[in-house]
Amino acid sequence: MAISTMLGSISCCPSPKGYEMVKQHSVRLKHCVFTVKSSVPVYSEGVNDGIKLHSFGNLVKKKVFLDTSKRFYFQGRWSESSGRRVETYAGVDVASAVDVINDLGFDTLTFLMVTVIIVPAFRILKASPILGFFFAGVVLNQFGLIRNLTDVKVLSEWGILFLLFEMGLELSLARLKALAKFAFGMGLTQVLLCTAAFTAFELPPNGAIGTKILEFLFHSRPDLVNIRSIDEAVVIGAALSLSSSAFVLQLLAEKGELPTRFGSATLGILLLQDIAVVPLLVILPVLESQDIGGESIWPMLAKESAKALGGLGILSLGGKFFLRRIFEVVAETRSSEAFVALCLLTVAGTSLVTQWLGFSDTLGAFLAGALLAETNFRTQIEADIRPFRGLLLGLFFVTTGTSIDMEVLFREWPNVLSLLGGLIVIKTLIITAIGPRVGLTIQESVRVGFLLSQGGEFAFVVFSLANRLGVLPNELNKLLIIVVVLSMALTPYLNQLGRKAADFLDERLDPGEKIGEDVNFDVSESIVIIGFGQMGQVLANFLSTPLVSDSDLVGWPYIGFDLNPAVVKESRKLGFPILYGDGSRPSVLQSAGVSSPKAIMIMYKGKKRTTEAVQRLRLAFPGSPIYARAQDLPHLLELKKAGATDAILENAETSLQLGSKLLTGFGVMSDDVSFLSKVFRDSMEIQAQEEITASETNAGLKPMQMKASDINVVSAATQKQVQLMKPMQMKASDSNSDSAAEILQETAGLSQPPEIDDSSVNIDNGFVGKADKAQD
C-alpha cells in the first residue's frame, strides 16, 4: 500500500495527530530543517522494502529506513556556506486509515447524540433547532469533541446541496418565471447596492470611515480593520452582500412560507446571489495577479461569465431530455436502492458540473431539482432525500458554530458588535427600499429585508480565497468570519423582528387610505373572504347567485381582501368587490367598514398563517362564524381549537368528488352516490369532534364499516352498489329488524339515513360540517 505524508505539517512543537515531535540536536539551527522549504516531501513505499524520498530541499545526505513498528525514520545533513553542519533526526508516525475512520465514527456518534437531544428540546421551547445546532457546534469545538473537523465540514456541505435540490423540486416552470422577476429585478439590485455601500464604508484605504468610527467609539487598533486597498474593500463588500441560503430556506420551510409571495421574493434573491458568486471567484485571482498591469479585468470577466452561462444552458437542455428518461428507466426496475442511488448521483453530478463551469455547487443542485419538478417522480424523490437533507443540514449548522474563534471574539467584542449591527442595518434598509419597486408591499419588503440581512456561507468561500491570495489579512479574515457566523445565528430572531416590524407598519398605516373606496354598498354585515385567489373567486361567484339568498338582493353581499396588488387589480376589472389589505387583521376590517361580519371565510393555504388568522378574528368577532381551509386532520383540529366554526379538508373533497364521478360512471344511481358522500362527510365530522374532545392529533384513518343487519329485501341498485364498494364491508348480523326498512327507504330516495358505527368511521379527507355546501 502506498503511503504518503506531508512533512510540511511537522513543526518543532507538539505535532498534529500521526506525527512525533521533530528532535533537534543542535542549538545552532534556527528553524526546523524540514519546514524551511515550501516544497512538500513525499514518502512512498516501493516494491521492495526501500523507501524513496523526493523534494527534500537542501538536504545533502538522505537516509531513510522502515522498521517493524511501521515508523519512518530519516536522517539528514544540511551544509551551510560557512561550513557549519547540523544533523537532525525526526520520526514520523504514519496515521492509518483506520484512525481517520474511527475519528469520523466518533464524530458521527457525537452529532447523532446532539441531534437526539437538541431537536426535541428546542421543539418544546418552541425555538428553531437551527440555533441549537449552532451553539452545539460552539460547545463541541471548545471541548475538542470533534476530532476530524475538516472531513466533517466537507460532509456537512451535502446538506446544503440536498436543501437546494428539494427547493428546486418544489418549483414549477411558471414559478421559476415568477422568481426571475424577483431575482433580476430585486436580487441583482440588492447585490450591487450592498456591495457599493459596504465598499464606500471601507474607503479610503489606510483611513476608512469605518476604521475611524471604531477607533473613536472603542479605541480599537488602527490596523485591526484597516483596509489596505480598493481591491480589498470591493472583495469584503461583495462578500457581505450575500445572504445564507441554508439558514433562510430552512427557516421558511419550517414556517411554511415558501409558497407565499414573500417566500418567492426571498428565494429569487438567494438564487441571484448564488449566481453572483461566480464573478467574485473570477475577479479575486485577477485582483491578486500583478501581471495585468493597467489592463481592464472586464474582458476576462465577460469571457469567463459567457463560458459559464453557455455551459449552464447546455446542462439545462441535456438534463431536460436525458435526466427524466434515466429516472424512467430506473423506476421501471422497481429497485428502491437503485432509485435512491440515482437521486444521490443526480445531486452530486450536477453539483460537480456546475462547479466545473465556475458556478456554485448549490446552483447545480437547485437546477437538478427544477428539471425534475414536473415529473411523476417528484414525490418519491422528496421522500428519499429528506432524511439525508435533514441530518446533513443539521451537521452543517453544527460546523458553522465551530468557525468562531472565541479568543478573537472575547478580545474584540465591541468591534464585532459594531460590525454586526452595521451589516444588519445596511442590508435591511437597502432591501426594504428595493421591494416596493418590484411589486412587494412595504410590509413584505421589511420582512424580506430583515430575513436577508445576515451574512452567507458563500462569504466563507470568498474570505478564504481572498486570505489565501493575500488580498485579505488574516486578522481581519477571522473578525469578518465571526461577524458573518453570528449574523447567521441571529436569522430566526431577525425573522421574528421583521414580522413584528411589518405588523407595526400595518397597524400604523391607515388601511382605509390604502385599500381605496371602490365598494358602493354597506359592508358592515357582509361575508368576508380573506385571500382572493382562484378558490376565493369561485366562492365569491357561488355566493353571488340568487339561489343562495331568499331576499331581493342578488345573492349574499360579500367583500374580499388580498395583499397581492395584481390580484386586487385584476379582480376589480372582473367586477369583484375586493379591497387591498390584510383581512386577517381586525383593524383592516374595521377601517373598511366591516363591524359585524355575517361570516368570515379564510382561504389561506399555509397552516400557520391560517391558524393565526383564526385566532385573531375569533377574538375580534366572537359571534361571527369562521370557516377555513385545513391541509390535514391535525391542522383541522388545530383550527377548531383556535376558534374556527368549521373547516374543510380540501384534498379530501377532491377525492370524494372523483370517487362520486367514478361510481356514477359505473352506473350507480346519483342518489346512492350522494348518500354515500354524505355518510363520509358526516362521519368525518363525528371523528373530528371525538378527536377534539380527546385532545388527540392522530392523522390516520380508522377503517370505515357500515352496519346494516338482516337485509332481506334490497333493491337491485343497492345490491349493485354494495358489490362495487368492496372496501366498505356491509355487515348484516348485528342489527334489528328496523334496519332493513331504513336502508330500503334511503335507497328509494327517502330522507331517513341508516345507522352507522361511529367508532369505525374512516375520516381523512373531505368537507367537515356545514362547509360541505361550499364546493370549490
Swiss-Prot record:
The keyword Membrane applies. It comes from the Eukaryota. Optimum pH is 5.8. Residues 1-72 form a transit peptide. GO terms for biological process: calcium-mediated signaling; chloroplast organization; nonphotochemical quenching; photosynthetic acclimation; positive regulation of photosynthesis; potassium ion transport; proton transmembrane transport; regulation of cellular hyperosmotic salinity response. Residues 73-93, 137-153, 203-232, 288-296, 360-389, 437-445, 490-526 are lumenal, thylakoid. It is found in: Plastid, Chloroplast membrane; Golgi apparatus membrane; Plastid, Chloroplast thylakoid membrane. SUPFAM superfamilies: NAD(P)-binding Rossmann-fold domains. InterPro entries: Cation/H_exchanger_TM (IPR006153), Na+/solute_symporter_sf (IPR038770), NAD(P)-bd_dom_sf (IPR036291), RCK_N (IPR003148). Its main location: plastid. Residues 524-649 form the RCK N-terminal domain. Induction: Up-regulated by low K(+) stress. One of its GO terms (molecular function) is antiporter activity. Pfam families: Na_H_Exchanger, TrkA_N. Residues 728-776 are annotated as: Disordered. Keywords: Antiport, Chloroplast, Golgi apparatus, Ion transport, Membrane, Plastid, Potassium, Potassium transport, Thylakoid, Transit peptide, Transmembrane, Transmembrane helix, Transport. It catalyses: K(+)(in) + H(+)(out) = K(+)(out) + H(+)(in). Belongs to the monovalent cation:proton antiporter 2 (CPA2) transporter (TC 2.A.37) family. KEA (TC 2.A.37.1) subfamily. This is K(+) efflux antiporter 3, chloroplastic. It comes from Arabidopsis thaliana (Mouse-ear cress).
